[in-house]
UniProtKB/Swiss-Prot annotation:
Role: Light-harvesting photosynthetic bile pigment-protein from the phycobiliprotein complex.
Alphabetized UniProt keyword annotations: Antenna complex, Bile pigment, Chloroplast, Chromophore, Electron transport, Membrane, Methylation, Photosynthesis, Phycobilisome, Plastid, Thylakoid, Transport
Cell compartment(s), UniProt: Plastid, Chloroplast thylakoid membrane
Gene3D superfamilies the UniProt entry points to: Phycocyanins
Organism: Pyropia yezoensis
Protein name per the record: R-phycoerythrin beta chain
Signal peptide bounds: none
Length: 177
């Protein structure tokens, strides 16, 4: 995983050049948006339990067979595993948002996730739906449009960060399906 600063250094080093020009401008822009990025990550992590539990509840409401005997969320142990997986996925989405780079999500979370779910018999369509619900909630918290909870956030438009987190959730959904 390379953050924005490390990427610039690695690229400049590969060219045997000093950091300058467009690379410095990109870093200045990254720093200027830093408070918004931190607030966006905080909005997700402060509401992570709510985001994940709502996503799993929504997934189950749409597919009640998941909690019937033989369903993948039947028994407390399986439900706990489902909630745990949702927390892990959302945590790595927040790491990617903080770094401004999806590689931590790809390398440490998504690599092999579909194969693991298939081996365990986890219904991928339900998992994708839960990720979709998490995506909508995370975007709502970042843009401060969540109906039940408003947060103090940095001034300015956070739509780019909302789009960024949405793209990370889309990566998760694509990796699972």
């Amino acid at each position: 995983m390379l953050d924005a600063f490390s990427r610039v250094v690695v690229n400049s080093d590969a060219k045997a050049a000093y950091v300058g020009g467009s690379d410095l401008q990109a870093l200045k822009k990254f720093i200027a948006g830093g408070n918004k990025r931190l607030d966006s990550v905080n909005a997700i992590v402060s509401n992570a339990s709510c985001i994940v539990s709502d996503a799993v509840s929504g997934m189950i409401c749409e597919n009640p067979g998941l909690i019937a005997p033989g369903g993948n969320c039947y028994t407390n142990r399986r439900m706990a595993a489902c909630l745990r997986d949702g927390e892990i996925i959302l945590r790595y989405v927040s790491y990617a948002l903080l770094a401004g780079d999806p590689s931590v999500l790809e390398d440490r979370c998504l690599n092999g996730l579909k194969e693991t779910y298939i081996a365990l018999g986890v219904p991928t369509n339900s998992s994708v739906r839960a990720v979709s619900i998490m995506k909508a909630a995370a975007v709502a918290f970042i843009t401060n449009t969540a109906s039940q909870r408003k947060m103090a956030t940095a001034d300015g438009d956070c739509s780019a960060l909302a789009s960024e987190v949405a793209s990370y959730c889309d990566r998760v959904a694509a990796a699972i399906s």
